[in-house]
Amino acid sequence: MKTVVITGGSRGIGAAAVRLFAGRGARVWFLYEKNHEAARAVARETGAQALCCDVADEAAVQRAFDAVGSADILVNNAGVCHYGLISQITPAEWRRLFAVNVDGIYNCVRAVLPQMLQKQSGAIVNVSSMWGQVGASCEAAYSTTKGAVLALTKALAQELGPSGIRVNAVAPGVIRTDMCASVAPEVMEGLRQQTPTGTLGTPEDAAQAIAYLADAPFVTGQVLAVNGGFVIT
């Protein structure tokens, strides 16, 4: 039985990944920051173990991974966004996005790596975004952090590959999650119309891609776009 750790697992893509891996018989732990009610609901539904942890807090992350023990798969899904002009983003907001979206991955990789190196085996899947590939107006900070995730993914794949550890990323497009709740309906409709498939994605779409990368033995350093063709590279 494989042990999977998923960050940001109380809702959206993270919760869908928890359900998918648990449904396939994995031993699942998920981290969440503050949505206790949602975390309890996901844990009850799936039998997964929930740990309250801000991934930007290095010490808290280490405590969480100490509780987990040895992990076979790490899914770095936790993330925050900010919508607004670059001139409107405060330094504190900018730093918070990097602390969660980039430093959070660094903290989790550092915490899980000793176990994976000892076993000479492991899989890491990072959740980026199509905006990390092409950028988005009024989402400069978010796009920048997600671009950093892609660069980190490729660098780690080269660094850790000789140790039997694969590192890949998914780059979701417009997915119907709480992160999109504040987006005006007409904007969402416009995005749907720009998507070649004529649909918006679901958390389950992204979770399926995550599960594939976690289990693909000859795939590393790759970015799997899950965007309905919105961005084709």
Tell where the protein language model's regions lie, with residue ranges.
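C-terminal substrate-recognition "lid" of short-chain dehydrogenase/reductases
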Residues: 199-226, 231
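Catalytic Tyr-X3-Lys loop
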Residues: 80, 87-106, 121, 125, ...
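Active-site helix of classical SDR
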Residues: 109, 145, 153
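Residue(s) in the substrate-gating loop at a strand-loop-helix junction
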Residues: 129
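Conserved glycine-rich cofactor-binding loop
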Residues: 10-11
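Conserved glycine-rich Rossmann-like NAD(P)H-binding loop of the short-chain dehydrogenase/reductase
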Residues: 24-40
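Substrate-binding pocket helix/loop in short-chain dehydrogenase/reductase
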Residues: 85-86, 93-98, 180, 187, ...
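Alpha-helical segment proximal to the catalytic Tyr-Lys
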Residues: 114, 158-162
